[in-house]
Amino acid sequence: MLKEFEGQMPKIDKKAHAFESADLIGKVEMKEYSSAWFNVTIRGDVNRIEVGRYSNIQDNCCLHVADDYACIVGDFVTVGHGAILHACTVEDHCLIGMHATVLDGSVIGHGSIVAAGAVVTKGTKVPPFSLVAGIPAKVIKTLDESNLDNIHAQAVKYKDLWSCLLYTSDAADE
């Protein structure tokens, strides 16, 4: 459901998709080929949220903002089931694991992976090409650029999945 908040309506590129059970509220922009899956909440009430090209926000995720921080998701980012992104920045080609939490003012550097269940605490700056895990999340490994191919492929796969689901749904309605 798209919901206006204080005169701001979510903007979804015509080549992006939000499933019916996803709630997008206020200052939200979804760029081309991005997707918001089932039961996602993306609430841009007191600041803005941007979801980059080919990025996918999987089932049961929550994206929110703070007065001082927007929530920015770069291009080719996968945000795993049940993750929470609160007023943070996730740079391009990142993977946020299932049920991970990234808190206010944090920046996840290009090509990084946040492990499932990790909690990235307020203001943390994760260097590019890092694997972080734990509570609080710490860098446990430096990654190389070979991981970008897998992260990129995962993002493209989710674009293909939602396209396939829509096509199958449309065919069933006929």
Task: Describe each PLM feature range.
Residues 1-15:
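Extreme N-terminal tail/first-helix region
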Residues 14, 19-20, 25-26, 31-32, ...:
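Left-handed beta-helix
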Residues 65-67, 143:
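Short beta->alpha connector loops at strand-helix junctions that form conserved
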Residues 129-130, 138-149:
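Conserved beta-strand-loop-alpha-helix hinge in the C-terminal portion
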Residues 137, 173:
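Short, glycine/acidic-enriched loop or turn micro-motifs at the edges of active sites
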Residues 152-166:
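A charged, well-structured terminal subsegment
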Residues 167-172:
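Conserved small/polar residues in nucleotide/adenosyl-binding loops
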